[in-house]
Amino acid sequence: MNEYGCLEVLMPMVQPKSLWDETKRSEQMGPELLGFLDRNEREFYLGPTHEEVITDICRQELQSHKDLPKTFYQIQTKFRDEIRPRFGVMRGREFLMKDAYSFYLEEDGMIKSYQAMKECYQKIFDEIGFDYKIVKADSGAIGGNMSEEFHVLADSGEDTLVFNDKDFSSNIELLDDSLKTEIEKKIENNDLSDIDSEHGKLSIKKGIEVGHIFELGNKYSKAMGLGVQHDNSQKTLEMGCYGIGVSRIVAAAIEQNHDSEGIVFPKNISAFDCSLISINEKKSEIVKKKAKEIYSYLINNNVDVFYDDRDAS
């Protein structure tokens, strides 16, 4: 994120309901918002996302077109009152997220920022080593002009993805009647079978959503009065937002990287490359000496080692 000119911040976890009332998302998200009252009976939410908060900050701090463009990001715990929390960190009420928000004077700038963040996310997921797809998606309660999701392909995924090997990919939730096709041949009783259509051969796979990027346009800036002085008038800003589910990345990595013995994390996100266990080194100087020789050799060859030298059986 830093390489793409983004500025790291840390925004408040506790958000006043009044900010959400400005965008009417307090009504849209409803029971998903985890709220409470303070001692003065004022309503607050534990932040599920931070569009309102960052817009409020920027309407106080950004005064001129000279302050633009800006993209802020944070890595922070989020809260959503999920109706059915399940699958450990895959879908919980509390999760870690990397979220970013961009602010531009013109729509062209916002679109370029969207493409830059898309490229940035591709680099991140490529470096991790995921087998993933980028698909068109419903923007949901966050809203905006358009959005795309990043899905790690896994049979345990909750989303169904439809794509070909060229230029078409979508979350199945977004498909309309134009993509329906008559099927004359018999197929196996499995909703994940490949099908032929006017778009070519379509593959249908399950995916775990690990990232989502949005062209917000002026949805939040207009509702909350975020603008700057430009050419002797007040110009409403164009926004984008971009999220990565940090907690979910761990679950997705496990789904794609395991064997009969357990988890095999990709090297770039593993805590260490190997474990070195010294057995009974307290009773044997030879074992102790050899273990330390092996440890030194591995460290000197840039191998990240977990050296377990506990006095335990």
Predicted regions located by residue number:
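NTP/phosphate- and nucleic-acid-binding module
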Residues: N2-S313
